[in-house]
Structure formats: structure tokens, C-alpha cells
């Protein structure tokens, strides 16, 4: 199943309706939207200065998305940014509960702390009201078993493939620059045939 990162829903409730319909047409399993204002900024860039969406307005987006879906299994995950914005645990819980009541299939609680303390505190208070999702980009050293013990349903490893690809591309570029040759890198990179295979364009090899 594919869960799409839908940012803030790309606008108002009308945009959210259209987004859900388009995703269902492409067999996407669900979408995660966050309660920040459109257009959004990455949560780790001055997160405490970012404004959050009005709760009722965001609930309206969730309801619009649920009303628009035709597939009963399509999921809307509501991402709570209150901890990122420095608004505290109580506000995060208030928002999470409002989003659950509005029809969210799961709630994602996000944090920029290097320890999972505030996430685990949220999980304890949340008490399995609905599935809970996390993104441990900053508190990556926490064992997955800790998340299981606190009733967390889904862990998203959000950006590590992108970051790994950057490291690999930098190393490849450095090698080519320093050796003025492809000999040292050819065995460490994907073949052209593999690229065609991933694109579903194997006929280009004929």
C-alpha cells in the first residue's frame, strides 16, 4: 500500500475533495495531511514560528476528504504539528481528538526532539483511541520495540532513501572527478537495463 504525503491538502476543502478522488483513481491507499497553513514549510525549518490551521477548518478538510472517497479502505491520516510549533502536549491531544472525531482514520504526531519523550507521552495519553503514526527522523536511535510497547501502529522512515541516494551520488561524482574514469564506479551503480526495468520500458532494450 502507498500512503501519499499530501502536505496540507494543497488548499481548502475543495482541493482536498479533488485530491482524494484523484488518488483513488491511481489506487493510492491513503493520504496524510498536516494542520499547517498552505503553502507549508518543512517542520524542521523554524517549526516554532509556523502557524497552524484553525482546528475546525482542518476538520472540514478531513470531512470533505472522507465524503469524497468511494473506496471504503482509503485512509486519511491527520498529522498534528502542535509539538513542532511549541504549543504543547495538551494542544496536541486536543487537535488529535478533534481530527479523530472528524473522521481521520489515523493520527500522526510529529516531533523535532532527539529523544522520544514527548511522543511517548502523547501515546500514553492517546491510549489507542485510533491508530497512531510517527516519523522518528530526529529520535532515530529509539528501538522500534519501544514504539510497539506504547501502542504506536505505524512508523514512517520518511527520508532515508533520499538521503542515502545523495550520499551515493556525491561519492560517485567525487570518484569520477578525481580519477577521470568510470572504471571504479561502474560496478557500484545501477545498469541502464535496470533503469528501463523500473520504468516499465524493457522494450527499449530491444
Where are these regions (language model features)?
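Alpha/beta enzyme core
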Residues: 1-153, 164-170, 174, 204
Amino acid at each position: 500500500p502507498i500512503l501519499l504525503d499530501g502536505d496540507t491538502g494543497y488548499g481548502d476543502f475543495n482541493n482536498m475533495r479533488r485530491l482524494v478522488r484523484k488518488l483513488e483513481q491511481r489506487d493510492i491507499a491513503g493520504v496524510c495531511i498536516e494542520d499547517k497553513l498552505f503553502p507549508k514549510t518543512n517542520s524542521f525549518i523554524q517549526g516554532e514560528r509556523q502557524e497552524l490551521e484553525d482546528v475546525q477548518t482542518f476538520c472540514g478538510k478531513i470531512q470533505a476528504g472522507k465524503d469524497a472517497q468511494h473506496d471504503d479502505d482509503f485512509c486519511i491520516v491527520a498529522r498534528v504539528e502542535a509539538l513542532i510549533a511549541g504549543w504543547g502536549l495538551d494542544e496536541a491531544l486536543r487537535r488529535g481528538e478533534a481530527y479523530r472525531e472528524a473522521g481521520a482514520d489515523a493520527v500522526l504526531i510529529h516531533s523535532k526532539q532527539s529523544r522520544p519523550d514527548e511522543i511517548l507521552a502523547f501515546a500514553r495519553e492517546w491510549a489507542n483511541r485510533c491508530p497512531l503514526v510517527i516519523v522518528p527522523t530526529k529520535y532515530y536511535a529509539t528501538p522500534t520495540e519501544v514504539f510497539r510497547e506504547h501502542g504506536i501502529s505505524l512508523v514512517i522512515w520518511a527520508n532515508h532513501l533520499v538521503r542515502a541516494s545523495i550520499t551515493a551520488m556525491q561519492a560517485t561524482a567525487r570518484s569520477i572527478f578525481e580519477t577521470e574514469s568510470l572504471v571504479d564506479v561502474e560496478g557500484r551503480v545501477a545498469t541502464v537495463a535496470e533503469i528501463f526495468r523500473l520504468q516499465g520500458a524493457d522494450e527499449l532494450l530491444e
